[in-house]
């Protein structure tokens, strides 16, 4: 998995140790540290907590809560962050440059014991992008049942969901994990 710290200019790509053999994660999954700063993350969480949450279930099992971003000011911040991630991603994968529509921004809240089981997006769903907004115990994004991504606040992850990469959100053990996500088509 390629990890890029946006606070450090002109740095070589770093790969997470122990994943060198797996070309799928090395070649297509990218993480961008500090795509949002901590204050922006707190603002997004506060706005979502002020709004309306909807419970998400799968087969009668609770998974998480979601809230849609409706504020123009937050939309502008997220448009810049996700657009920046897509631009950086397209510099590595030119086909991503053809993605010109996002699906809006959804804040996802995982409470203690909440999780999203391993799954993949349907073929043709484009590119999936997520930004971690909070620190907590558990709730990490994991690919292929074994490779966790950096879960520091403000880190964005982007990958081609059309490749059907199996991913999951691990159970939260303490606190709340917030992500904001979108899909590019």
Residue positions per predicted region:
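Non-heme Fe(II)/2-oxoglutarate
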Residues: 2-99
């Amino acid at each position: 998995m390629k990890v890029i710290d946006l606070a450090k200019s002109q740095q070589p790509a770093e790969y997470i140790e122990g994943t060198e053999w797996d070309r799928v994660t090395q070649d297509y999954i990218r993480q961008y540290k500090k795509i949002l700063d901590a204050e922006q993350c707190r603002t997004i969480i506060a706005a979502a907590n002020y709004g309306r949450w909807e419970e998400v279930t799968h087969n009668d099992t609770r998974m998480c809560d979601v809230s849609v971003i409706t504020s123009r000011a937050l939309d502008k911040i997220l448009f810049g962050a996700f657009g920046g991630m897509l631009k950086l991603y397209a510099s590595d994968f030119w086909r991503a440059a053809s993605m010109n529509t996002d699906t809006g921004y959804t804040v996802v809240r995982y409470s203690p014991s909440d999780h999203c089981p391993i799954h993949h997006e349907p073929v043709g769903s484009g590119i999936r992008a997520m930004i971690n907004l909070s620190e907590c115990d558990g709730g990490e994004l994991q690919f292929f049942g074994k490779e966790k991504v950096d879960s520091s606040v403000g880190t964005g992850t982007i990958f081609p969901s059309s490749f059907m990469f199996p991913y999951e959100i691990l159970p939260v053990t303490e606190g709340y994990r917030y992500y904001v996500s979108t899909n590019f088509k």
